[in-house]
UniProtKB/Swiss-Prot annotation:
Ligase as UniProt keyword: yes
Transmembrane segments: none
Keywords: ATP-binding, Ligase, Metal-binding, Nucleotide-binding, Queuosine biosynthesis, Zinc
Pathway: Purine metabolism; 7-cyano-7-deazaguanine biosynthesis
Its EC number(s): 6.3.4.20
Gene encoding the protein: queC
Catalytic activity as recorded in UniProt: 7-carboxy-7-deazaguanine + NH4(+) + ATP = 7-cyano-7-deazaguanine + ADP + phosphate + H2O + H(+)
Protein's name according to its UniProt entry: 7-cyano-7-deazaguanine synthase
Length: 229
């Protein structure tokens, strides 16, 4: 192992291919991290996000982009993994049916495993608790609790080489996220946020994710490159 490899600052970054996670990759890169990105083919209906994730990883200089296959549609329970459940096209009360049971817990666990193998001590996730859909696994207390678990459940953690779960977007509005990413050179035309995106990555313009994205660009005063079908 070279001296550079020994001393480089590595991070594993969960990259869905959407606006938030693309911004997080740019933020980590700006902090000097060598970026390893991880996406999941979990049976989601909006599979165009996987192509978007690969584009973003390449554009932002990730040294490795890994796609993990999971069969969360075998569990179901979400409009994103069960085609018999419609994606809502208007805001609803409570936790919406687009919540995927335990998704961020599963994703962070696999990112944690890869981070331990790589010798990375920082794991980035693009969760947000301001302009968001109300998912329980996007809240600060979830991130803090997972970090405690990570340091109890791993060889590196119990040997004192602790992990940090970084959620730099946690308290930002969607417009602040758009502004930050734009300043860091994120090409948002490469991203896909829509829960019902077609194979070409074109958005429905009606789902909660589309609404939050459009409102963010409008509030930021930045042109929205989203393509619609």
């Amino acid at each position: 192992m070279s001296e550079l490899t020994k001393t480089e600052k590595r991070a594993v970054i969960l990259l869905s291919g959407g606006l938030d996670s693309a911004t997080v990759v740019a933020m980590a890169r700006a902090e000097g991290y060598v970026c390893y990105t991880m996406s999941f083919d979990y049976g989601q209906r909006h599979r165009a996000e996987l192509d978007a994730a690969a584009r973003v990883a390449g554009d932002l200089g990730a040294v490795e982009h890994k796609v993990i296959g999971l069969n969360l549609n075998g569990i179901g329970g979400s409009a994103l993994t069960d085609s018999s459940i419609a994606v809502p096209e208007s805001p609803s009360e409570g936790i919406p049916v687009t919540y995927v049971p335990a998704r961020n817990t599963v994703f962070l666990s696999l990112a944690l495993g890869w981070a331990e193998v790589l010798g990375a001590r920082d794991i980035f996730i693009g969760v947000n608790a301001v302009d968001y859909s109300g998912y329980p696994d996007c809240r600060p207390e979830f991130v803090e609790s997972f970090e405690r678990m990570a340091n109890l459940a791993t060889k590196a953690g119990v040997e004192g080489q602790g992990f940090t779960i970084r959620a730099p977007l946690q308290n930002l509005s969607k417009s602040d996220i758009v502004k930050a990413g734009t300043a860091l050179g994120v090409d948002y035309s490469l991203t896909v946020s829509c829960y019902q995106a077609d194979d070409q990555g074109r958005a429905c313009g009606k789902c909660d994710s589309c609404r939050l994205r459009a409102e963010g660009f409008t509030a930021a005063g930045i042109a929205d490159p989203t393509r619609y079908f």
